């Protein structure tokens, strides 16, 4: 089925969120356009909102937005919190737009294809920057490949790692396992060279999930796991010998095993102090936290005297918790955690109700969300424009892929 120009424009608007992600707040433009379109459409036809996918999208929005609303009433930084509460309202009509834009299977396939091509371009650009010292994002000036994101915005590794399932599974569906394996290898190399250890962990999660997805038996899964392990060891060993910058990051990571607190802090880039402070904030404000986006404003009151972040930034310390569970707990409290976990229980039940072939349609986005939320990792701030845009994009596209309830397993 061919899409009309209007339908293609809607898919293009949705795809543009990914396309503009490396360029700061530019990614807000298609979100606002989509939100305005949805508001106009709902005014014309309010009955359109009765579908199950709309209700699930509203639930996803509520689980994110209600915690910040409740946290804002006694926030330690009320202006910051209420501003965040107001601006995040844009995700509600954008949720409607996303479901509308992807109502047709052809639209969903088109979005996946365009997204896969975009991500492949990011991968090749990152590899070119590593090989030749320059790419579309500029020259290689730091100790990490930055790709299209640029040297002042080192987010390539985590973003590529999270989105890699889209490219790999599109390649698998269109061109077979050999081509998908080649795409996986290129993505792995780009994530490795990007140097973000959080990205490495996310990509490991993605790899395990992809192997489980394509393996026809436990024996094949174990065999694939062994091959992936050998390939990873070879790539890491080669990079360690050829790149002093990469070797330095590996050495910092291995410092975690020297048995000292200092070694652990070095390996975690001093995040252990942030996590302890976030935990203290959560205990001091158990119900609704210190207020959304108020973490930095309350950091000084809870940080230890020898906190490394106070030396780096005496006025505020760390900006966010660097872990999504601790971010939600410290900024929105137990109420926020309850909302987030309730949402994921509901989504898990929806996923469990899908037949095997229906799960294939949501597989790429399921794996991406798993990698994004994997708890044994570090994370960007989820209550921020950059990471929340990607989170909602993945979550809403996942919801839009779901078949009507009558087509699911009883």
Describe every region a protein language model picked out:
Residues 1-5, 177, 234, 353-363, ...:
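A juxtamembrane structural motif centered on a specific transmembrane helix
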Residues 1-83, 102-109, 113, 117, ...:
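Transmembrane signal-anchor hairpin modules in multi-pass inner-membrane enzymes, especially those
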Residues 15, 93, 107-141, 149-217, ...:
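Alpha-helical transmembrane segments of multi-pass inner-membrane proteins
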Residues 18-24, 327-332, 363-401:
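Membrane helix-loop boundary segments at the extracytoplasmic
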Residues 38-49, 203-228, 354:
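Perimembrane helix-loop-helix junctions
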Residues 193, 214-262, 266, 276-284, ...:
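A membrane-periplasm/extracellular boundary helix in multi-pass inner-membrane enzymes
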Residues 262-273, 288-332:
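Long extracytoplasmic/lumenal interhelical loops at the membrane interface
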Residues 331-371:
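Hydrophobic transmembrane alpha-helices and their immediate junctions
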């Amino acid at each position: 089925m061919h899409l009309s120009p209007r339908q293609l424009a809607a898919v293009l608007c949705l795809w543009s969120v990914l396309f503009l992600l490396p360029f700061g707040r530019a990614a807000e433009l298609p979100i606002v356009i989509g939100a305005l379109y949805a508001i106009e459409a709902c005014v014309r036809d309010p009955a359109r909102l009765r579908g199950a996918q709309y209700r699930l999208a509203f639930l996803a929005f509520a689980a994110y937005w209600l915690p910040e609303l409740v946290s804002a009433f006694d926030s330690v930084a009320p202006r910051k919190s209420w501003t965040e509460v107001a601006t995040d309202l844009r995700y509600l009509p954008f949720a409607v737009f996303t479901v509308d834009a992807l109502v047709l299977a052809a639209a969903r396939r088109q979005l996946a294809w365009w997204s896969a091509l975009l991500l492949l371009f990011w991968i090749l650009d990152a590899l070119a920057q590593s090989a030749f010292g320059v790419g579309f994002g500029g020259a290689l000036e730091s100790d990490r490949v930055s790709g299209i994101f640029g040297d002042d915005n080192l987010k390539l590794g985590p973003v590529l790692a999270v989105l890699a399932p889209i490219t790999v599974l599109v390649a698998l569906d269109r061109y077979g396992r050999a081509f998908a394996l080649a795409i996986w290898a290129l993505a792995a190399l780009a994530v490795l060279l990007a140097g973000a250890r959080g990205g490495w962990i996310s990509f490991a999660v993605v790899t395990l999930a992809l192997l489980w997805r394509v393996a026809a038996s436990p024996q094949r899964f174990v065999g694939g796991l062994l091959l992936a392990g050998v390939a990873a060891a070879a790539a890491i060993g080669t990079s360690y010998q050829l790149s002093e910058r990469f070797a330095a990051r590996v050495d910092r990571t291995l410092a975690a095993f020297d048995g000292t607190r200092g070694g652990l802090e070095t390996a975690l880039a001093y995040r252990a102090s942030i996590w302890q402070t976030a935990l203290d904030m959560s205990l001091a404000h158990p119900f609704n936290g210190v207020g959304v986006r108020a973490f930095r404003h309350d950091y000084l009151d809870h940080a230890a005297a020898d906190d490394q972040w106070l030396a780096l930034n005496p006025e505020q310390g760390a900006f966010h918790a660097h872990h999504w569970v601790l971010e939600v707990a410290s900024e929105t409290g137990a109420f926020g955690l309850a909302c987030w976990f309730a949402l994921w229980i509901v989504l898990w039940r929806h996923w469990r109700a899908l037949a095997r072939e229906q799960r294939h349609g949501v597989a790429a986005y399921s794996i991406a969300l798993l990698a994004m939320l994997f708890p044994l990792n570090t994370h960007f701030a989820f209550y921020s424009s950059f990471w929340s845009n990607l989170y909602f994009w993945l979550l809403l596209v996942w919801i839009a892929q779901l078949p009507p309830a009558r087509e699911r397993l009883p």
